[in-house]
Structure formats: C-alpha cells, structure tokens
From Swiss-Prot:
Domain of life: Bacteria
Residues annotated as domain GIY-YIG: 2-77
Taxonomy of the source species: Bacteria, Pseudomonadati, Pseudomonadota, Gammaproteobacteria, Enterobacterales
Organism listed in the record: Citrobacter koseri (strain ATCC BAA-895 / CDC 4225-83 / SGSC4696)
InterPro entries to which the protein is assigned, alphabetical: GIY-YIG_endonuc, GIY-YIG_endonuc_sf, UPF0213_domain, UPF0213_GIY-YIG_endonuc
PANTHER family membership: UPF0213 PROTEIN YHBQ (PTHR34477:SF1)
This protein's name: UPF0213 protein CKO_04549
Family that this chain belongs to: Belongs to the UPF0213 family.
Gene3D superfamilies according to UniProt: GIY-YIG endonuclease
CDD domains, alphabetized: GIY-YIG_UPF0213 (cd10456)
Amino acid sequence: MTPWYLYLIRTADNALYTGITTDVARRYKQHQSGKGAKALRGKGELTLAFSAQVGERSLALRMEYRIKRLTKRQKERLVTEGEGFEALLASLQTPTLKSD
C-alpha cells in the first residue's frame, strides 16, 4: 500500500493551501508549473510549508478536510511547530464506537 501525505503550500500573499498526495515532490512541481490545483494558479511564488505522512487515502482525506477548516492562526502553528498534528491524526485513526 502506497502511503499518503498531507501538505501545505504557502503562496506569495502568505495564504496556505492544503492538499494530499502520494508523492509530495511531484505534486509540488505540478503546482509550481501551473498544472496543479486551480486555486494556486497565478498566486506567485509557492513554497512547501509543511508535509507529513498520514497513512491510507481515507485518513488523508479526513485530515485534509479537518485542516482546511482550521483558522489561519491554527494552520500557522501547525506549519511552524507541528502543533496539533499528531493529536488530530490520532483522533481520526481511533474508531468511534456508537452505544445504543
């Protein structure tokens, strides 16, 4: 099974874009060449701000969803300190049990 990664790219205007991939270097090059996400086209210089291995695709999708809903300040803490990443990953890996 190929591992999936979550990544954040910083645009020239300091915005953070969140995405998932199986190959961060390849995907980053696609974004830089304008062949990646439409949201990043014409945004100037792009820098890879953060990347981490997540695991399987379904978990990566859930992580991406949650991180896209964080505030800018929370995303900045994730990028600079890795704050909250492991806890978020663990919370999504833990199956929730429903009680009747």
